[in-house]
Amino acid sequence: MGHFTEEDKATITSLWGKLNVEDAGGETLGRLLLVYPWTQRFFDSFGNLSSASAIMGNPKVKAHGKKVLTSLGDAVKNLDDLKGTFAQLSELHCDKLHVDPENFRLLGNVLVTVLAIHFGKEFTPEVQASWQKMVTGVASALSSRYH
């Protein structure tokens, strides 16, 4: 899953503290649903997902995106135990929701894109490397209970 250096931890925590979870969460999930339209099948109850404006303006997309990013806050606090942190969510997504674990990797990559957009020059290659390590670790942790 990758070892997080003290510098990685400081970089991740610092940027996380500046992030508007609600805005970034909605944008991240919205972009996932738009860029990878097959992921929409997991969100049948969200209503109209027929266009970019429908997806990005959908209150259920925004609310669930906030929920997803809020749970990512648990990762920021528990970088040394991502597998344990996400054990229950991994079981839920495997056994009940039947989500393809590849989607976790895609979501992480979309989040990195959103962070780059939101933070601009502050999102240096070093910051990106730390965040990429984290989202890869989270995707791996969320996939850990699949069988």
From Swiss-Prot:
GO biological process: hydrogen peroxide catabolic process
Modified residues (S-nitrosocysteine): 94
Sequence positions bearing N6-acetyllysine: 60, 83
Keyword terms, alphabetized: Acetylation, Heme, Iron, Metal-binding, Oxygen transport, Phosphoprotein, S-nitrosylation, Transport
InterPro entries tied to this protein: Globin, Globin-like_sf, Globin/Proto, Hemoglobin_b, Hemoglobin_oxygen_transport
Reported function: Gamma chains make up the fetal hemoglobin F, in combination with alpha chains.
This protein's name: Hemoglobin subunit gamma-2
Organism: Pongo pygmaeus
Lineage, highest ranks first: Eukaryota, Metazoa, Chordata, Craniata, Vertebrata
Annotated gene: HBG2
